[in-house]
Amino acid sequence: MRVTGLGHASALIETRYGRILTDPWVNPAYFGSWFPFPDNSGLDWDTIGQAEYLYVSHLHRDHFDPEHLAKHISKDTRVLLPAYATTELRDRLEDLGFRHFVETVSDEVHELDGGLQVMVQALTSPTDGPIGDSSLWVSDGQHTVLNQNDARPGALDVFQQLGPVDAYLIQFSGAIWYPMVYELPTRAKQALGEPKRDRQFDRTLRYIDECDARFVFPTAGPPCFLDPDLWEFNDFGDDPGNIFPDQSVFLAWLAEQGHDEGRLLLPGSVSDLALTGAPVTHAIDPASVFGANKPVYLKAMQERRQPEVEAAKATWAHPEIELLPALQEWFHPLLAESTRMAAGINGGIRIVAHDTDRGDIDLLVDFVAREVRLYDGEKVRYEWRTQRAYLEQLVHEHEIDWVNSLFLSCRFSAKRIGPYNEFVYTFFKCLSEERLNYAEGWYEEQDAAVAAETIELDGWEIQRRCPHLKADLTRFGNVDDGKLTCTMHGWKWDLASGRCLTSVGKDIRAARLGEPVPVGAPAEHPAVDTPDERGQHDDEVD
């Protein structure tokens, strides 16, 4: 079995029974902000696209590239389809001309032609990807690959039951807008970015230790930013708070932790798992893209590819769209159906759309009155600003996932009072009736099924499953001075009160050893009016 790197989360897994192409992404994503690093546009995609199988893990645009899929990937390929709660991924692929699908069942092994075995684990909470993220396990009877990309399973036990893993592909770098877009002083952003970066590495190491694979291939990041407006987000090694460290930085850190199984995959790199040590042959000299040469490399890449962004920018403004009535028509039915999310937000979100020539539009999405109206000085906890053209483009395309478009573009600024609120994030990725109803139902089920199982941790008895996304706290829980941190995403709780310090509506059941643990969910606590303790949702949400 051979694994060929194709850039970011994309790889070609070559087995004796056929080839699987994963997450091919080439074109700029998220309002032209993200590009694969290093540049993979020069690969022979027409040949690569003849693979027998295609796996698109989820609908994030750095994994799902519709333009590239339509142009370069054979429509005769068989698509390995995760078992998501909605049909959006299949619908999008069918719109591109794909017709042959392998409908997988999450956590079940499927045997394909000739004996090739695959298993796709689908994660389906509202905060997993755009209503879904997934991992792919592949075995040809001789070697095994686990491609986790940027999925965050609570544990890897389902995969471990299938035997040792030879190659483990896993995300390690940031994929989010936090803390860069927040309206804070530079030093404050650096202070928030450093623990975020540390958590990314620590979380990845926990997965690596749990998987215990023969070889580890850090993938699925980081992107690079070629637009001059976003250039500062690239990591050139001079900012310890930068959340986008590259593969060379992570592999050096991994070696410092005593791990020698790390392997570097660049676009065109090939690792043969059948050879001793799984040596990697590179098509690109790593020294030419990392370290001191990285700024030079990115400047040259910017010269080649920034025209793609400029061409896209020219299409975003839609002066014919009247934003207020358009958003009222779109949002009002959703707000009327939103129960859990509206209660969780319990206030207004201010949205300011700037335009120097045409004038600004200042809007309020009111989750109490369930309406969109012009902002009139109301006190709000949550506020974000962007360009009017970007908001018009979202309306023009009827983009139902603003997280997977504008927010990940980092082409906005934000501020808030108090802690991160998961319901704000979830609402803006659920701007369709189907998505919103799914998310509302998911929250309803979680509240109704509070787990009774508890664990003992550093003098406390605590519910075993994290209230956020059900991570096993025996693996991911750390207690320090009465504060619990779930290192899966960095969420924090005050154990004495059970109060979540990171978001609202996610309290925990806990008591000191020897005292009774609350049977139901703790009483709700009022929202915090002061800045949180920066147990920031690690992925707001990456």
Describe each region flagged by the PLM.
Residues 82-143, 245, 252, 261-265, ...:
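Metallo-beta-lactamase
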Residues 271-465, 472-476, 484:
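Feature captures hydrophobic
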Residues 33-81, 161-191, 403, 480-485:
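Active-site metal-binding motif and surrounding structural segment of the metallo-beta-lactamase
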Residues 16-59, 66-71, 128, 152-164, ...:
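Pre-active-site segment of Zn-dependent metallo-hydrolases
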Residues 65-68, 445-525, 529, 537-542:
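Rieske [2Fe-2S] iron-sulfur-binding domain
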Residues 1-42, 433-455, 540-541:
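Zn-dependent metallo-beta-lactamase
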Residues 80-81, 156-258:
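Cap/insert and terminal regions of metallo-dependent hydrolase folds
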Residues 5-16, 110-166:
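Catalytic core of the metallo-beta-lactamase
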